[in-house]
């Protein structure tokens, strides 16, 4: 249970490595990372988008495969190569007319710290670093890449009366 008024939430922003994918990365022969993504996380992201909850990514990484996957699932804001994530976060708020208390940010490590100090509802996977776990309003029982995004989104959609509330829920 998230101890926050989830009715206020209009957007959920995710980091990628350690949140949407596991903490480990395989490398291809060119030195590029290969990530494994959770299908149930993907289902929840596309459902949230259909139900009007904005989902976004702010990551330091750069992967065309990640961009394509999440845009396919309905994300309109996929920010990559963000060396200072807080600047991208502030731009996101301005562009969408949102305030900190409208946002859940799901992060797992120190590069997420500044944003998580600002947002109304900071959340993290169970395997996040200690500093992030301590500052989170909600620590998912799921590890990054293993259902954490689904867990957070399902709690938000249920609280807003949008989980399985329309025929949109029963397909991709």
Which role fits each region the language model picked out?
Residues 1-16, 162-172:
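Non-catalytic pre-domain segments flanking phosphatase-related domains
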Residues 7-25, 116, 149:
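Asp-based phosphoryl-transfer active-site loop
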Residues 8-10, 53, 101-102:
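Short coil/turn segments at beta-strand junctions that form active-site/ligand-binding loops
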Residues 13, 17, 52, 74, ...:
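Conserved functional loop/turn residues at catalytic and ligand-binding sites
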Residues 15-17, 41, 108-112:
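Acidic active-site catalytic centers that drive phospho-/nucleotidyl reactions
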Residues 20-51, 59-60:
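A positional/architectural concept
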Residues 34, 72-73, 77-78, 86-172:
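Mg2+-dependent phosphoryl-transfer enzymes with acidic/Ser/Thr/Gly-rich catalytic loops
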Residues 45-68, 79-80, 116:
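Substrate-recognition element of Asp-dependent hydrolases with the DxDx(T/V) motif
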